[in-house]
């Protein structure tokens, strides 16, 4: 092993590995599947091929000037993906709620404002040492206790005893900042998904909030603002990597059990807090590491970690980042320490971090591990800013913040010409033009047809259908995410035949026979397939729209039919609406169970992550604005639902209908809305 990579052996009891299993276990399962049979998973194979194609031209910058240009562009792209950051910061309004006195340090329970009305809970571990101190921001991963968790406490206590001012914070939606007041709530899947429509993914909010934590550190008289570091493990490692890359006030950055490659995420189940929409369309993880240069960077990996965080994947990114550090005459950075261990932030990892922070924030030592001083941990409840149920009643949760921002966006929204709105939808969905997609039509029996569809390289879809009874009759394109044998599909076929129209059944990619195994995480039935699509900058909903448009165009070209209407229920309902809204060659839609708004102050329930298109509320509008683009073509809505999957009551249904009716004007008979289950 190269001299810049340190291997540390660690024997530890399983009981010390306290990990949030609902996150890591799916990751490990998917990581195993990665090596077993990728060919058996056509959608995953397609995603990986697409990612590899996007990044095949990556090469080290020729010189420092070339890197500076790449760096500027990448920062612009990242800020765009994160939805931008406020130009003016909300006042910190910091308050110390309580102080715990300990022999070598004191622990202060602190809250401060990061965004208007949004407060971060934190703990400051303040050494009893005079003079300006180096400081370390400790961010947590997906351990249930967040900043209170023993894994986080251990490094806080160790750093404080070694003379560092330490600030441990709760991430938005986790720890004391969860929806409920008990520790252990998960901020990912359909909780974090509420942020996508407003264009503010959780990964970006974490970067901004960790920057506000630095603002707080700089406000403390005990802290030397020129000597600040950041560290965390797992999801906290991702926070460390991104915040360290973005905020140059961090002089030493130490992500733990988190660095790998973006392409390794494709096949794993990772938290929404780790997703940067479109990241693979702009870069690989190595370039994020390179953004830290010329500041100090230590990466700690575990030999028994999941594939996406594995030693080998981390080594790929480190190797690709090292040429950038060399441009600054820093060939020994980034440092890579490998610990024989499962996913963790254990004592050998902490000791490696202590040596690194001591070297780069104190100017002492060579960066070799420093033995951990004796530490005492607190009861998690004793560290809480708001123990038990004492949190203020007006506390703003993550979904409530998303809903507040969404309402503000809609209130300030200006009407857009239909052509511009269609263009915006096309861009937000990642491009839905059929492009070079092809299809071959065969007739296995009189009056029936099969369409072998190749929408993109590496993908093949098969449609079955029945011809219209005459050239004057229409055709219903039935969209399903539950397989062509589902009872609802059979019923739609029967209704079409009774009306004399033809029908075709399209199984949406990544569903039915192409369903991704283990796709559901929590309330998100399509968590992994939708997440992988976001990494590519191609929301899964947009891929469905592309397939729908290609199918409709080929059917119109190859079959005698007077019109093509879309029929959808549940999965694919918003994709159907978006397809007919964008493509004026589709003649209408009959949709059951359509989500009626992206605005939700609670986690989504009964919805698809695929439909939570990043930035759609900000740049286009709500579901109603998309629906208006269908006019004057027929649109029939049955049992539309709330963001929590509940049918609209009569009053809400009437309100929705009244909002839509002006778009149809003299064609009101073409707009139908039926409430209920």
Model-derived features: positions:
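N-terminal secretory signal peptides that target proteins for export/translocation
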Residues: 1-17
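Loop/turn elements at helix/coil->beta-strand transitions in domains of secreted/extracellular proteins
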Residues: 132-134, 162-165, 224-227, 248-252, ...
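Primarily recognizes the serine-hydrolase "nucleophile elbow" in alpha/beta-hydrolase
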Residues: 213-281, 551-621, 625-626
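Cap/lid segment of the alpha/beta-hydrolase catalytic domain
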Residues: 131, 136-219, 259-271, 478-554, ...
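Bacterial N-terminal signal peptides
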Residues: 18-31
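Catalytic-domain carbohydrate-binding cleft regions of carbohydrate-active enzymes
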Residues: 231-235, 240-251, 255-262, 269, ...
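Alpha/beta-hydrolase-fold catalytic nucleophile elbow
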Residues: 170, 231, 256-257, 300, ...
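Alpha/beta-hydrolase-fold serine-hydrolase catalytic core, especially in secreted/extracellular enzymes
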Residues: 36-119, 293, 300-474, 482-493, ...
